[in-house]
């Protein structure tokens, strides 16, 4: 059994509440594995005086800026799949590249987390994805995940986008058909896709229990939309209550995701809990000062730094340029991205990696 397969087994075992994952132990084991198998990461750590023998806690593991995935090979072995970020600025060479040695490790993280936050009632539903099918987007981690979701939880699966984008007319027709039957449905896709549907004037009342997952991307929109405005539009145009609208926060550079806690909280009898992005036990997020990379105080704004054990096949600690803050004791809120120049802390890490 490969090391990545061991981690996948540990993640699956920790889904049961009685067997929480030992995050510290696994974080150190994952770091030792990556230190041994990713030469660029090992050189970077050695320049900082960090080795498996010099650290004692999970938060001692050095972070790698997400930008590094654009230019450095960070895989622990031959990849079973390679996912790429969707950004096109600067050409294909500027897109992030995440090589995955074991797809089952990504699945072991993604599928139970999706089920926990989107399907807390244990239902199976028709799945309408506002995305191209895997054959058209094999390098999309989101498309890959949705394919697994359809296999695991879908009574049927339809992909409503193609090489020219979202097929709004076809989607509108399918929604009208579902409205007529009263059957509940799962909709999933980028926020921008839903906004295009709303701007088309589509108005239906989908069956009780219908739900929606949006991924937060607004690229290509003529106008920005607030979260509150988006939730209102979901009710106005689809008849989906706000507590059945679940935002997903994910990155190509991570194998784990966070989800809006609203639906899970409702089924757990916590309807008054604040909306926040919550992840699995094997994903931890620190909020760091953009200049010093020191942790900020509770509720203060800083850069999101994710420690994802499901990233065992590449690098587990990824420093983003997303700004956020902690909410309650288990969640975060995204407040946007750093504007303008790269944050000083990120820039220093990028310089060190370039010298490694």
Where are the language model's segments positioned?
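Long, hydrophobic, well-ordered secondary-structure blocks that form the structural core
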Residues: 96-139, 143-160
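Active-site glycine/GP-rich loop and adjacent strand/helix microenvironment
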Residues: 1-11, 21-33, 39-40, 124-126, ...
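Active-site diphosphate/adenylate-binding microenvironment
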Residues: 33-84, 92-99, 112-121
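Short secondary-structure boundary/capping elements
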Residues: 77, 106-109, 166
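Hydrophobic alpha-helical segments that mediate membrane insertion or helix-helix packing
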Residues: 84-89, 260
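Anionic, Ser/Thr-rich low-complexity intrinsically disordered regions
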Residues: 1-23, 56-59, 64-72
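Gly/Ser/Thr-rich beta-alpha loop segments that engage phosphate groups in nucleotides
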Residues: 89-92, 252
């Amino acid at each position: 059994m490969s090391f990545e397969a061991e981690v996948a087994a540990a993640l699956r075992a920790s889904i049961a509440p009685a067997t929480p994952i030992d995050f510290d132990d696994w974080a150190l084991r994952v770091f030792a594995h990556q230190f041994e198998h990713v030469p660029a990461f090992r050189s970077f750590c050695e320049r900082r005086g960090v080795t498996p023998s010099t650290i004692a806690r999970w938060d001692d593991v050095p972070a790698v800026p997400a930008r590094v995935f654009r230019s450095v090979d960070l895989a622990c072995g031959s990849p079973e799949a390679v996912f790429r970020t969707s950004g096109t600025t600067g050409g294909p060479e500027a897109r992030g590249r995440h090589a995955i040695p074991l797809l089952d490790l990504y699945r072991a993280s993604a599928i139970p987390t999706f089920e926990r936050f989107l399907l807390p009632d244990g239902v199976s539903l028709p799945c309408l994805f506002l995305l191209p099918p895997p054959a058209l987007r094999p390098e999309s981690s989101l498309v890959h995940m949705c394919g697994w979701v359809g296999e695991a939880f879908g009574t049927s699966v339809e992909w409503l986008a193609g090489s020219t984008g979202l097929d709004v007319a076809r989607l509108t027709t399918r929604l009208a058909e579902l409205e007529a039957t009263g059957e509940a449905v799962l909709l999933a896709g980028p926020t921008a896709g839903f906004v295009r549907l709303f701007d088309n004037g589509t108005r239906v009342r989908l069956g009780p229990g219908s739900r929606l997952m949006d991924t937060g991307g607004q690229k290509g929109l003529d106008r920005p939309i607030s979260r509150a405005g988006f939730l209102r539009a979901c009710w106005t145009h689809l008849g989906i209550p706000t507590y059945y609208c679940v935002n997903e926060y994910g990155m190509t550079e991570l194998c784990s995701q966070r989800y809006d806690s609203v639906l899970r909280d409702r089924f757990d009898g916590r309807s008054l809990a604040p909306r926040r992005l919550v992840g699995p036990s094997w994903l931890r997020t620190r909020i760091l000062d953009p200049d010093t990379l020191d942790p900020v105080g509770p509720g203060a704004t800083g850069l999101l730094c994710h420690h994802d054990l499901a990233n065992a096949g590449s690098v587990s600690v990824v420093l983003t340029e997303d700004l956020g803050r902690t909410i309650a004791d288990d969640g975060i809120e995204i407040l946007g991205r750093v504007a303008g120049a790269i944050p000083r802390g990120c820039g220093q890490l990028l310089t060190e990696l370039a010298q490694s």
